[in-house]
UniProtKB/Swiss-Prot annotation:
Gene3D superfamilies: 2.70.40.10
Pfam families: dUTPase
Record GO biological process: dUMP biosynthetic process; dUTP catabolic process
The species this protein was found in: Legionella pneumophila (strain Corby)
Pathway(s) of this molecule: Pyrimidine metabolism; dUMP biosynthesis; dUMP from dCTP (dUTP route): step 2/2
Designated name of the protein: Deoxyuridine 5'-triphosphate nucleotidohydrolase
InterPro entries per the UniProt record, alphabetical: dUTPase, dUTPase-like, dUTPase-like_sf, dUTPase_trimeric
Xref: PANTHER family: DEOXYURIDINE 5'-TRIPHOSPHATE NUCLEOTIDOHYDROLASE
Lineage: Bacteria, Pseudomonadati, Pseudomonadota, Gammaproteobacteria, Legionellales
Primary role: This enzyme is involved in nucleotide metabolism: it produces dUMP, the immediate precursor of thymidine nucleotides and it decreases the intracellular concentration of dUTP so that uracil cannot be incorporated into DNA.
Class of this enzyme: hydrolase
Amino acid sequence: MHQVIQLKILDSRIGDTIPLPAYATDGSAGLDLRVCISEPMQVAPQQAVLLPTGIAIYIADPKLAAVILPRSGLGHKNGIVLGNLVGLIDSDYQGELKISCWNRSQEHFTVNPGDRIAQLVFIPVVQASFEVVNEFTESSRGEGGFGSSGRY
């Protein structure tokens, strides 16, 4: 599936010294988001910072949204994860994409201009309506949760 999304460049370095968001491989689900800062920045242990990307997107289609997700290598190797775990970008949002970066490690982490720090994935959206009921139609699971379907 291919969808054209409007992208606004908010910082002139984007597309020049800092590449536009791009898929790293043909099979990548997420576009790499890069940090748009002027100089290297230290993120202290347990510190959370909001990092600019220098871009804004407008999805427009209410059947689509985007999520900002962490890059697996940064979390596993460096303890760098998203402070909000997942960033949800609604179809009508038009502001700058920012990355909430949390250093959960015990070491300082340096973020350099143009570093790939997160990824952007587009997802389908179902806008649901509710039917208020007194009882649910019975299912095999019922109210079982938190491990009720098996240990692993």
